[in-house]
Amino acid sequence: MALVTGQGAAAQSAPRSIQGVWKIVEAAISGPAARTIAFTERPNLTIITNKHYSRVEVQADGPRPILADVAKATADELRAVWGPFVSEAGTYELAAGGLITMRPIAAKNPAVMGPGVFITYSYKLDGDTLTLTQQRNQNGPFANPFALKLVRVE
């Protein structure tokens, strides 16, 4: 795409890249329980650099409770506060065919950061909108993949 100034000079825009700061705005779940979840009230942030990514999100439909004293909280109270919180960081690789494979290094859930663990998504970048659709992980293809719609924050 070229940008033409009033004096006739043209400048080339920066190449399209998934690198940046993103916010999930929607999750579309397929399969028997298909539905779309709006993320407008779900705090989240995904940061993608040249080789690494980091994501945090709250997967709850409303605000999480605030505990007066964490040391005195019951197991159910702790689950209500920390259960919906997701965090993960790792490396990623882009491949032909619009695929991105993510390999977690650190995560709230230790099961997703072991040796050989990965998840591959197809991705589509349309301006400042990034769509990620699950394809497969170390166990094989997803029977009912979900798709995430993210918008660029910066």
Please provide the spans of the model-predicted regions:
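Bacterial N-terminal signal peptides
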Residues: 1-5
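Lipid interaction determinants
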Residues: 6-154
